[in-house]
């Protein structure tokens, strides 16, 4: 591994490409003091403004949305636990973080928070929109990341 890459952020959205990104990093020889933070971003369920819907029904919808968020967070944590385990078995100090928000913004925030020097992403993620060669988050990260970006297919 290049001497400059000791703190890596991996976007781990559970997609096949992101799982390959985790495997790719796991196969690298960890440098002394090297660490990996796997980041899973959950986009919160946003309810539209519903002024004409009765308050009781709005409250029920909000409760259901919160339950969906909790369920998605639990699934994300299980996926992260698997990624962290694979990295730890390969000798990396690794941890997983679930963040809520927009994927690119949260990955960039994680880079800053972890003082990362490399971002590793799968070429395409779990999003509904498919790009021809590169997913929207990977494409935007290549343009906006303050650190090097490694895209794994």
Predicted segments, located by residue:
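Structural beta-alpha unit
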Residues: 1-3, 17, 70, 74, ...
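Small/aliphatic-rich secondary-structure junction motif
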Residues: 2-62, 90
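Glycine-rich, Arg-bearing micro-motifs that act as flexible, cationic patches
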Residues: 5, 118-143
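Conserved beta-strand positions in the Rossmann-like core of class I SAM-dependent methyltransferases
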Residues: 37, 95, 150
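Short secondary-structure boundary segments
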Residues: 40, 122-124, 153
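Short glycine/proline- and acidic residue-enriched helix-loop micro-motifs
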Residues: 59-71
